[in-house]
Amino acid sequence: MHGRLPLTAQTHRRLVVKVGSAVLSGPQGRQHQLAIAAQVAALRAEGREVVLVSSGAQATGMQKLGLTEKPKSMPGKQALAAVGQPTLMLLWEQAFSWYDLKVAQVLLTAEDLAHRHRYLNARQTLETLLEWGIVPIINENDTVMVEEIKFGDNDQLSALIASLVGADLLILLSDIEALYEADPRTHPEAQPIPYVERVDAGVLRMAGDSPNRVGTGGMKSKLLAAEKAQAAGIPHLLLPGTRPQSIAEALQGAPVGTLFAGGQRRYSGRKLWLYQLPKPQGEVVVDAGAAKALRQGGASLLPAGILEVRGQFGVGEAVRCLDEQGNLIGVGLVNYSAAELARIKRRKTREIEALLGYKNTDEAIHRDYFALASELE
């Protein structure tokens, strides 16, 4: 048993709190929402900053339309989110108004955070909102998402946001009370695990499927979020969102839920951003010489080393670099689009301008914007 210490406002000032759909839906959903607003207000009164990541647009849309099952088609889900998101924000605004706290809606897509410039713009906006004393409420922009580049669920989004704003702690409020030794639905004797030092393969195996009709994130998703947070050195609390004072109790050191240690920060800056990117859609295959130079570290990828370009991508997007055997070398940001690279592959840098009519840079991928696969594990 690991004794948990208090997480004070002095050491854990900036928090990201994610609320799951299952907590906000159902007959008790509004009561849970009001209780969470009260807890956030109490955190603010302690001098902490809070960014809220709220699921529930589709679940709220289901309630408004009287549906019992979520549509299976992507357009149906997007329309449902469009119906539910305004009401979800109104409910949050009303809940926080009891404590004279103002809120701001921030809708993001995976594509927003996959572009470095937009990523930094999002950070600046959130920093400004926090400086103004406003509670940012973030959700994935479901109405414009596409399956190939969506976050997957708000557990993953919350981990990215925690990294984006440099949070001291990530809190996931869920209908899942804690990480258990085994699935408590099929193993009633299973005990909750109060503390996890590191999310490894053994811990991931503890995750069972926990589907529900309104949400998308089960235990595996929460463990993957914890893994992302650990890479940034951010501790993560998994707490029961239906328990009125679960945040306060956990921050005081009570064995509520599961605390995942932050550990040593493995990445920072651009490398951390590359590690947390959604799966890149494009690929470039490089020759043996380029593969060796990239793997040894410190080298940029030049067009001459590119043998093949796969997929569609634009300037500044992330692509996977593969060797001729199909092994992943790493992930980097391209200085040319897929169409441009297809024209200048296997060519010398001095030929770029003649082939394209212009030259952005000599490098297809600069070494400062490339992370080896071994760094991303």
From Swiss-Prot:
Assigned EC number: 2.7.2.11
Limits of the PUA domain: 281-359
UniProt-annotated binding residues for substrate: S55, D142, N154
GO cellular component: cytosol
Location, primary (coarse class): cytoplasm
Binding positions for ATP per the UniProt entry: K18, S174, D175, T216, G217, G218, M219, K220, S221, K222
Catalytic activity, as annotated: L-glutamate + ATP = L-glutamyl 5-phosphate + ADP
SMART domains found in the cross-reference section: PUA
Cellular localization per UniProt: Cytoplasm
Keywords of this entry: Amino-acid biosynthesis, ATP-binding, Cytoplasm, Kinase, Nucleotide-binding, Proline biosynthesis, Transferase
Single Gene Ontology MF annotation: RNA binding
Keyword ATP-binding in annotation: yes
InterPro entries named in the record: AceGlu_kinase-like_sf (IPR036393), Asp/Glu/Uridylate_kinase (IPR001048), G5K_ProB (IPR041739), Glu/AcGlu_kinase (IPR001057), Glu_5kinase (IPR011529), Glu_5kinase/COase_Synthase (IPR005715), Glutamate_5-kinase_CS (IPR019797), PUA (IPR002478)
Keyword set includes Repeat: no
Domain of life: Bacteria
Gene Ontology biological process terms in this record: L-proline biosynthetic process
Function noted in UniProt: Catalyzes the transfer of a phosphate group to glutamate to form L-glutamate 5-phosphate.
Family recorded in the similarity comment: Belongs to the glutamate 5-kinase family.
NCBIfam families, per database record: proB
PANTHER family attached to this UniProt entry: GLUTAMATE 5-KINASE (PTHR43654), ISOPENTENYL PHOSPHATE KINASE (PTHR43654:SF1)
This protein's name: Glutamate 5-kinase
Species per Swiss-Prot/TrEMBL record: Meiothermus ruber
Encoding gene per record: proB
